[in-house]
Amino acid sequence: MIIRVLGAGAGGGFPQWNCRCDNCRRFREKNINARGRTQSSIAVSADGQRWVLFNASPDIRSQLEAFPASHPSKGVRDTGIHAIVLIDSQIDHTTGLLMLRESTRPLQVYCSEMVKQDLSTGFPLFRMLEHYCGVEQHTVPLDGSGFTIPGIEGLKFSTHSLKSKAPPYSPHRHDPHEGDNIGVIVENLENGRKLYYAPGLGEIEPHVRAAMEAADCLLVDGTFWREDEMRHAGICDKLAREMGHLPQSGPGGMLEILNTLPNARKVLIHINNTNPILDEDSPQYRTLSEAGVEVAYDGLEIVL
């Protein structure tokens, strides 16, 4: 199984277009050891030819252009992307569907019932796309049972609900429902190795812990370093957990949890532009490295 990180940043990417936080300012001044990052998305394949896209970010066109395996190879109009799994209905994970409207066949979209509702009402992308290529929506199970995707041989997918947040536009932003956010286990049926993908994690529930323990690679929420990061950066008073993200540092933080999982490859993704781990010379980045935790970047490839 091949995992390609198309985008490793949180909403807005890095640098964010209107941000002058320490990281963004220093990046523009070329005074920081950091890589730019587009908004989070990955692609997964068993054979390197037929790929499943996880989330469709607003940066999808440039992400796919930088990813030769997705380019047309069998005719005038073609793509290596055969299906799309949506983790949630956040704007930075779904807007890219509009950029895929030139598809010559309906987009095969796998998502929860709650995401389907959001993308049919509050942010009606599915209805808009009916006037272009169309969408064939497939509802994923939330009980952890496995499913396969037609045309994607050698991979099995399992999904479960996570405690995080529905997007701000959703009518149930402050009234959580199962399926607002999901985690995904992708299993390589040839060798049994597993990826656990959860770019938005607000709480480690027992079923999440079990999935993390069973995985050979964890690609998980790296949004914030500290609970009050947005306040510390002078941006707003929202706390990390209020926005549905476990910070890396502090009691019960992501780093503490990852330190109890010594056998898996551990990679943080969905990294906010304010997070000091973007600076590869920072003490926070060094702390992660010493703990065996990687920071995802655009173009990273993982083989399981």
From Swiss-Prot:
Keywords tagged on the record: PQQ biosynthesis, Transport
Biological pathway: Cofactor biosynthesis; pyrroloquinoline quinone biosynthesis
CDD domains reported in the protein's UniProt record: PQQB-like_MBL-fold
Sections of the chain in a coiled coil: none
Transmembrane segments: none
Gene Ontology BP terms: pyrroloquinoline quinone biosynthetic process
InterPro entries xrefs: Metallo-B-lactamas, PQQ_synth_PqqB, RibonucZ/Hydroxyglut_hydro
Pfam families the UniProt entry points to: Lactamase_B_2
Signal sequence residues: none
Superkingdom of this protein's organism: Bacteria
Family per record: Belongs to the PqqB family.
Biological role: May be involved in the transport of PQQ or its precursor to the periplasm, in association with PQQ biosynthesis, but is not absolutely required for this synthesis.
Name of the protein in its database record: Coenzyme PQQ synthesis protein B
Lineage, opening ranks: Bacteria, Pseudomonadati, Pseudomonadota, Gammaproteobacteria, Methylococcales
Gene name, Swiss-Prot/TrEMBL: pqqB
